[in-house]
Amino acid sequence: KIDGKVFMWSRKGKVIDVPDKIKNQLKSLMNEKDCFDGELYVHGWDFQRIISAVKRKNSDTDKLQYHIYDMPEPNKTFENRFLKKDLNSLEELNIKIVKTDIVDKKNNLEALERFYVKKAYEGVMVRNRNSLYEYKNRSYDLQKVKRFEDHEFEIIGGKCGTGKESGLVIFKCITEDGVEFDVRPKGCYEDRSYMYKNLQSY
C-alpha cells in the first residue's frame, strides 16, 4: 500500500489489475507501506478461469479471493512477522489468511499432506518458522511437498490450449468412475502441437 493506494505485482514484476472488491478490502486491512505475499485464488477453479477473471471483468471477478501467505518484513522471522490483523471488520471477506500448521515429525507432515490432498489441494508448503523473508530468490527455508502418482486413463477428447499453450493439445480423460478431467501430456512444444493436429488418432 503506497500513498493510500493498493498495488499488486506478479513474481516477475508485472503489474496486476487488482479487482475492485479485493482492492477496497485490502485498503481497509493494510497500513501505509504494508506488503503482503499471496495470490489471487479460488479453491476448485483452474488457472485459466482465475486468469480470465483477472484480465477481463466477468461474473467470476467479484468471487476472486486474495490468499495471503506471508508479510515480508526484513530481519523478522516468519513467526514474528506473519499477519495477525483482525479481519472481522470486513463484511464480505475476499481476503484469506492461509492456515499455518506446526509439525515436528515427518509422520505428522505426511499425514497433513494427505489431509490437504483429499481436500483437492496440490500439496503443502513447508517453511522454517525461524526463517527470514528472501526477496526474488527461491528459499531453501520454503519447500513444496507434492506427491506424484501415475495412472492410466482413457482419452475421450481434447482441445487447443490458449495463451502460451495456443496450438498445443490438452487432453480430456475419464476415470473408471466416469469423472472427466483435462490433462496436459508430457512432451515438448513440437510433440504437443503434433498431438493436437492429430487429435482424432487418440
Q: Predicted segment positions?
A:
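Nucleic-acid 5′ end/cap handling module spanning
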Residues: 1-14, 56, 74, 91-202
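Covalent nucleotidyltransferase
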Residues: 1-96
